[in-house]
């Protein structure tokens, strides 16, 4: 390695779990000696192949694979590689620009590191790194050792592609750390919703750390006490060449699984289940990709494009707070403004709003999902790769809280749509996405009536929700009917 070198790969089994995520790694040098590596991962809008959907039966169908190889040597970009990438993706300028951005990001990180080392007269990072990693490991272990030791189990059923999947977890807590074993989890799917081991490890460890040691910095030391095993060949540990393009569909459920284990040992409770898995369809245009074209329209004249939208349902209610609405947990991905999508592709959003009544009822309400309607601008037909979970198995509540609303997918015209796989939105029609809500926490009859009224006035729930789930009646002037509310709550007091 030399200054100015950059390395690139999108190998799912080495990095982020599917071909759409490209990782760039850059060595950093101080006074001619290597002192560290900077790395970042970016989700590109397209990587060729079938796209970011679950329809592929092997990873070879899912796009262009880039093994670990030089992106640049001593500051000179590998033009042959970039030419190959541009030739294999539907949006070459965007993808190439993203790759350059990754390299620039690492370069900026390296410049700041060197400036810090100059300022504090640090020759290398060995002792500093060891100190941080050792301290972080001990801090995480201290939190783990304070928990009741034992083995705690939880199971979660999810929709799957064509049949339900079961994620089984057994969490062993000891002085040595936390080990999560996924023995008993469903076998691998024939479709691209499978998870590679490193992605399983990452989201399992993240779920544990969120609750056990959230304030400890993320590094090799703080994560070392959290270990994971998953049987080879199960949906959480597939080997090449099994399909993995939509691996987030399953992987994003893992924190909910481990939360269910930790709920049994954490006295303050843990959040209820949330929508968890992103609803992020890839949207295509082009005459060869759509099934519905107006009579008399030349299919060759339809615009060719590819884009991805990221949207999310509601998060689970917390032990002392309502769940966050339309918020991506555990991924942390920010929702793309609809104006940004409309500016880069012939896509038109007709509606985007909170989904009334979708948050699970509870002393603390689950976060709301959202309703989104979109179609092609100027009567353009669209092809979508759908990866929608929580349609048949909604997010469960906790401590007496109710489940969030299940997701729903339809066309505005009424034609049914499958929640997973390639679909077509005809000209002048629109797909309607009703994203799932998060589960509630605690008995709904314990919720402060004032908060129920506020939810009603804010359009978060309906009057029927307030009466049926919470035992709260609000008159036409927005005032709580205390007599009727007390009567309803007396009929079914909190458990």
In which residue ranges do the predicted regions lie?
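Glycine/proline-enriched, intrinsically flexible loops and inter-domain linkers
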Residues: 1-495
């Amino acid at each position: 390695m030399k200054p100015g070198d950059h390395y690139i790969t999108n190998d799912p089994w080495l990095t982020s779990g599917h071909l759409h995520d490209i990782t760039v790694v850059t060595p950093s040098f101080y006074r001619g000696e290597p002192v560290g590596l900077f790395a970042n991962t970016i989700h590109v809008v397209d990587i060729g192949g079938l796209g970011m959907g679950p329809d592929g039966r092997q990873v070879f169908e899912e796009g262009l694979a880039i093994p670990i190889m030089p992106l640049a040597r001593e500051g000179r970009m590998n033009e042959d590689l970039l030419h190959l990438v541009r030739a294999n993706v539907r949006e070459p300028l965007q993808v190439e620009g993203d790759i350059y951005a990754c390299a620039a990001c690492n370069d900026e990180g390296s410049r700041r590191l060197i400036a810090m080392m100059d300022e504090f007269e640090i020759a290398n990072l060995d002792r500093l790194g060891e100190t941080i990693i050792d301290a972080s490991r001990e801090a995480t272990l201290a939190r783990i050792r304070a928990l009741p030791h034992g083995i705690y189990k939880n199971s979660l059923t999810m929709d799957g592609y064509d049949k339900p999947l079961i994620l089984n977890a057994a969490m062993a807590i000891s002085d040595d750390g936390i080990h999560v074993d996924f023995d008993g989890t469903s076998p691998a799917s024939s479709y691209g919703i499978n998870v590679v081991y490193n992605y399983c490890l990452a989201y399992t460890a993240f779920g544990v750390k969120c609750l056990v040691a959230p304030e400890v910095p993320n590094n090799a030391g703080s994560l070392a006490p959290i270990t994971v095993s998953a049987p080879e060949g199960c949906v959480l540990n597939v080997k090449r060449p099994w399909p993995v393009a939509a691996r987030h569909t399953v992987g994003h459920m893992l924190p909910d699984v481990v939360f269910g284990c930790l709920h049994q040992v954490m006295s303050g409770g843990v959040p209820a289940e949330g929508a968890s898995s992103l609803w992020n369809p890839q949207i295509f245009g082009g005459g060869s990709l759509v099934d519905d074209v107006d009579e008399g329209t030349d299919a060759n004249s339809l615009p060719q494009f590819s884009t991805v939208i990221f949207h999310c349902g509601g998060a689970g209610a917390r032990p002392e707070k309502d769940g966050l609405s339309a918020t991506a947990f555990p991924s942390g991905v920010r929702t793309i403004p609809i104006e940004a999508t409309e500016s880069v592709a012939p896509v038109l959003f007709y509606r985007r709003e909170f989904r009334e009544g979708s948050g699970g009822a509870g002393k603390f309400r689950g976060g709301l999902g959202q309703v989104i309607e979109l179609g092609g601008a100027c009567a353009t037909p669209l092809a979508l790769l759908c990866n929608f979970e929580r349609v048949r198995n909604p997010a469960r509540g906790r401590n007496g809280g109710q489940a969030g609303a299940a997701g729903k997918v339809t066309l505005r015209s009424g034609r049914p749509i499958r929640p997973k796989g390639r679909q077509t939105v005809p000209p002048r029609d629109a797909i309607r996405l009703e994203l799932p809500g998060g589960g509630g926490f605690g008995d709904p009859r314990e919720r402060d009536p004032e908060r129920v009224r506020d939810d009603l006035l804010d359009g978060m729930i309906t009057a029927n929700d307030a009466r049926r789930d919470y035992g709260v009646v609000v008159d036409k002037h927005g005032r709580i009917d205390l007599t009727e509310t007390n009567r309803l709550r007396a009929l079914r007091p909190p458990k």
